Amino acid sequence: MKKIILLGATGSIGTQTLTIIRENPEKFQLVAFSFGRNIERGRAIIQEFKPKMVAVWHTRDRVTLESEFPDVKFFNGLDGLREVATYLDGDVLLNAVMGSVGLLPTLDAIEAGKAIAIANKETLVTAGHLVMQAAKEKNISLLPVDSEHSAILQALNGENRERIEKIILTASGGSFRDKTREQLSEVTVKEALKHPNWNMGNKLTIDSATMFNKGLEVMEAHWLFGVDYDDIEVVIQRESIVHSMVQFVDGSFIAQLGTPDMRMPIQYALTYPDRLSIPYEKEFRITDFSALHFEEVNYERFPALKLAYNAGKIGGTMPTVLNAANEIAVAGFLNGQVAFYNIEALVENAMNRHTSISNPNLDTILQVDQETRAYVKTLL
């Protein structure tokens, strides 16, 4: 029985994680979780799973729930996330919060000796050098929840990582993959949130459309697998059936295929190196796909991906700037303050004005993050 701590329980990844826990009560127990603003959903999770500790974002929600569930310990805010992440009785932390707010709880959980299943890619983007060093010192493996990185992990099982020629991350191309740059000037939030293959949260769906999401995944792969940026390639795979591939020095490829269902990588992170069956509505049959299509990425069409590669290669605090600027720009788009077409421009503006600080400590990363957010907000 693995005792699970789940950060971001009411989001897309969190909700699907709860499905896995619900379907495997003999394998998993939810002992602590966090949620943001959806108190009705949070209340329902408490009633169903009966956790010992819960973190909410707002003080008023903590006060409300404390009166309803006197046997549960409640915390709120970032401090609450950090308390829950290190809950003594938890075995595994699955971090599914969105944004750089997930960094400190992850570092705390590593220090506390928890196994880490990481869906919060911003943690590695902003502080990969600190996180990987901390995990190494504690002899803790970070198991990826992203479908692409889970695919790479599976492709590398039993392989010598020194024999990697290239990591190939696949991308659907997002909701606007067939539109020109000129056509993007008129797109709406509603249109942007229609992903062709995956069911994801709003922020992630927009990031998929710009391909900032794939850029963050490139940086994540760099840290998780120790591969240089020049040896990480992104290709468009329209069907989202091939989740990613590894090319080896002998020219062979190992790929992981499967239905575009996030339960698969989530469950694999929780059961690694074991596997459990998953009840699908429709069985995946490879013969249903008479052809799989692969295309090179047009970096003029998707400048966000080029910005991400540049930020990763520059290193230091530049990935923090890219991530923080993108979070504010996407929030501005979702709130109607920014045109979709201008998301990349805002990020590029923030990067151009920043001089990267090499090998930053945690305080520097947090300071740069806040300064970048404040600056981009002035541009909305």
Curated annotation (Swiss-Prot):
Pathway stated in the Swiss-Prot or TrEMBL entry:
Isoprenoid biosynthesis; isopentenyl diphosphate biosynthesis via DXP pathway; isopentenyl diphosphate from 1-deoxy-D-xylulose 5-phosphate: step 1/6
Q: Which InterPro entries match?
A: DXP_reductoisomerase, DXP_reductoisomerase_C, DXP_reductoisomerase_N, DXPR_C, DXPR_C_sf, NAD(P)-bd_dom_sf
Q: Name one GO molecular function term.
A: manganese ion binding
Tell me which Pfam families the record gives: DXP_redisom_C, DXP_reductoisom, DXPR_C
Please give the cofactor(s) recorded in the UniProt entry for this protein.
Mg(2+); Mn(2+)
> Which residues are listed for NADPH binding in this entry?
T10, G11, S12, I13, G36, R37, N38, N120, E122, G201
Q: Where does Mn(2+) bind?
A: D146, E148, E217
Keyword rRNA-binding among UniProt keywords: no
Q: What is this protein called?
A: 1-deoxy-D-xylulose 5-phosphate reductoisomerase
Task: Give the species this sequence originates from.
Answer: Listeria innocua serovar 6a (strain ATCC BAA-680 / CLIP 11262)
